[in-house]
């Protein structure tokens, strides 16, 4: 596969998309949604191949469930595309405007990024989500999904490209790297003549590889240890419910709770309540002070080196007792708190200290970490959750897939 040819085609498509009207882009999205439903039999047949190969490869049931498409899920994906149609198109909107002393009207106008390369996990719905968001914002995309969803993704991209052609937009607006060869990922990361941004969705290893090898700006996101600190002033019963939601609602999510920090003055009362709530469901990984109050835990082990640096993505929870909010913050700084973190407290000053000190992309007071999500934030779908500080931070919706240009309008004005 020649990635330079792919890149050239994407760049040409991006120039056309940049001037496409919202109506034309929405028309393409509507056709994509309809074609997903019309081609359900072919898509589900391709997905069945992926599922069978996954079983032969020994994938876990949880992983197979992430790969699985059925009629209900496919209809949901189609409706998600229709929801993108209803979102406001940010392209062309003015961020701000002013008239200078020389009479020039100067504004900042939102524009597409250009070509976005996305390397992502083995979830077929992500292929559609990313394509739809990039299309709505006038960006061309080059996609590289997990090898476990190869047949599903090939069929989905075929449907997308057919819909684009029917809408009068270039099929190369959405392209897929067909071969699972890892060397092609390395080549994509060097394609800076054609690709404007790389978004890796996956584990720390993928992010590290992209940062070290890419000559293209990389948005780092998804990975980060999520914490909840239960302060001494917190409502303990309500805090237990929030911790359960953050840990057990969807433990494989990147915004699920990894480490629980508990104020030493309420640990003796709070931790037995937590054990009673989560016993039989969660494995507790504990330091000595916490262990002393968790004697009735059914699944528990002592914390070892690296445990508090682990994004569990499972029914495992690190637990530590701390002296106060400052020690909680210090622990978070030491253990990669960059994604979603929360404090349970009824103390205003402690809440503000936590908000101002936490280095996370999203910080919550008396709320679950599970809210870090484009849909929950009212952004619609998201292309990723950024944990870095440049360009975008937190859930990346439509606006985060744009940049801006300065536009100056005057009456044949020359600089003095």
UniProtKB/Swiss-Prot annotation:
* Chief location: cytoplasm
Pathway terms, separated by semicolons: Amino-acid biosynthesis; L-proline biosynthesis; L-glutamate 5-semialdehyde from L-glutamate: step 2/2
Give an example GO cellular component term for this record: cytoplasm
Q: Which reaction does it catalyse?
A: L-glutamate 5-semialdehyde + phosphate + NADP(+) = L-glutamyl 5-phosphate + NADPH + H(+)
What does the record give under GO molecular function? glutamate-5-semialdehyde dehydrogenase activity; NADP binding
The record ties this protein, via Pfam families, to: Aldedh
Recorded hits in SUPFAM superfamilies, A to Z, give: ALDH-like (SSF53720)
Alphabetically, which GO biological process terms does the record hold? L-proline biosynthetic process
Task: Report the domain of life of the source organism.
Answer: Bacteria
Keyword terms, alphabetized: Amino-acid biosynthesis, Cytoplasm, NADP, Oxidoreductase, Proline biosynthesis
Q: Where does the record say this protein resides?
A: Cytoplasm
Q: Supply the InterPro entries for this chain.
A: Ald_DH/histidinol_DH, Ald_DH_C, Ald_DH_N, Aldehyde_DH_dom, G-glutamylP_reductase_CS, Glu-5-SA_DH, GPR_dom
This enzyme's EC code(s): 1.2.1.41
Q: What does this protein do?
A: Catalyzes the NADPH-dependent reduction of L-glutamate 5-phosphate into L-glutamate 5-semialdehyde and phosphate. The product spontaneously undergoes cyclization to form 1-pyrroline-5-carboxylate.
- What family is this protein classified in? Belongs to the gamma-glutamyl phosphate reductase family.
Q: Which NCBIfam families match?
A: PRK00197.1, proA
* PANTHER family reported in the protein's UniProt record: DELTA-1-PYRROLINE-5-CARBOXYLATE SYNTHASE, GLUTAMATE SEMIALDEHYDE DEHYDROGENASE
What's the protein name? Gamma-glutamyl phosphate reductase
């Amino acid at each position: 596969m020649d990635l330079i040819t792919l890149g050239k085609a994407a760049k040409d498509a991006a120039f056309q998309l940049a001037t496409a009207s919202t109506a034309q882009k929405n028309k393409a999205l509507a056709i994509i949604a309809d074609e997903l439903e019309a081609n359900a039999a072919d898509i589900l047949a391709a997905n069945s191949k992926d599922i069978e190969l996954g079983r032969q490869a020994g994938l876990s049931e949880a992983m197979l469930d992430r790969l699985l498409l059925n009629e209900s899920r496919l209809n949901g994906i189609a409706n998600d595309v229709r929801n993108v149609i209803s979102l406001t198109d940010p392209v062309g909107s003015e961020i701000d405007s002013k008239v200078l002393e020389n009479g020039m009207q100067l504004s900042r106008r939102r524009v597409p990024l250009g070509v976005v390369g996305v390397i992502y996990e083995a979830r077929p719905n992500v292929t559609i989500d990313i394509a739809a968001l990039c299309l709505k914002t006038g960006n061309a995309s080059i996609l590289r999904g997990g090898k476990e969803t190869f047949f599903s993704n090939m069929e989905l991209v075929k449907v997308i490209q057919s819909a684009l052609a029917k809408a009068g937009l270039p099929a190369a607006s959405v392209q897929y790297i067909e071969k699972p060869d890892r060397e092609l990922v390395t080549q994509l990361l060097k394609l800076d003549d054609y690709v404007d941004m790389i978004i890796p969705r996956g584990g720390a290893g993928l992010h590290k590889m992209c940062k070290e090898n890419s000559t293209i700006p990389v948005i780092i996101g998804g990975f980060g240890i999520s914490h909840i600190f239960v302060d001494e002033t917190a409502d303990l019963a309500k805090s237990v419910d929030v911790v359960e939601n953050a840990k057990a609602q969807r433990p494989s999510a990147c915004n699920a709770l990894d480490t629980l920090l508990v104020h030493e003055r309420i640990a003796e009362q709070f931790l037995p309540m937590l054990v009673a709530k989560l016993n039989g469901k969660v494995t507790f990984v504990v330091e000595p002070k916490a262990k002393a109050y968790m004697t009735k835990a059914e699944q528990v082990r002592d914390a070892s080196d690296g445990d508090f640096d682990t994004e569990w993505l499972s029914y495992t929870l690190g637990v530590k007792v701390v002296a106060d909010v400052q020690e909680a913050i210090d622990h978070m700084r030491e253990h990669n708190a960059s994604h979603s973190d929360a404090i349970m407290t009824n103390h205003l000053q402690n809440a503000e200290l936590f908000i101002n000190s936490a280095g996370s992309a999203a910080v919550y007071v008396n709320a679950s970490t599970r809210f870090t999500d484009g849909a929950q934030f009212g952004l619609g779908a998201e292309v990723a959750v950024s944990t870095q500080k440049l360009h975008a931070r937190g859930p990346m919706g439509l606006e985060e897939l744009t940049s801006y240009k300065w536009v100056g309008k005057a009456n044949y004005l020359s600089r003095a």
